[in-house]
UniProtKB/Swiss-Prot annotation:
Its main location: secreted. The presence of a 'disulfide through disulfide knot' structurally defines this protein as a knottin. GO terms for biological process: defense response to bacterium; defense response to fungus; killing of cells of another organism. Granular hemocytes, small secretory granules. This is Tachystatin-C. GO terms for cellular component: extracellular region. It is found in: Secreted.
Length: 41
């Protein structure tokens, strides 16, 4: 399952780029720059 959150810094990866890692661990911004995706290891 994916945990979505609107919290986080306004940093986005450009289209086709890998997501930037951020806290909480294993989270990154999605390419749509609307939220970051938290995924278990």
């Amino acid at each position: 399952d994916y945990d979505w959150s609107l919290r986080g810094p306004p940093k986005c990866a450009t289209y086709g780029q890998k997501c930037r890692t951020w806290s909480p661990p294993n989270c990154c911004w999605n390419l749509r720059c609307k939220a970051f995706r938290c995924r278990p290891r």
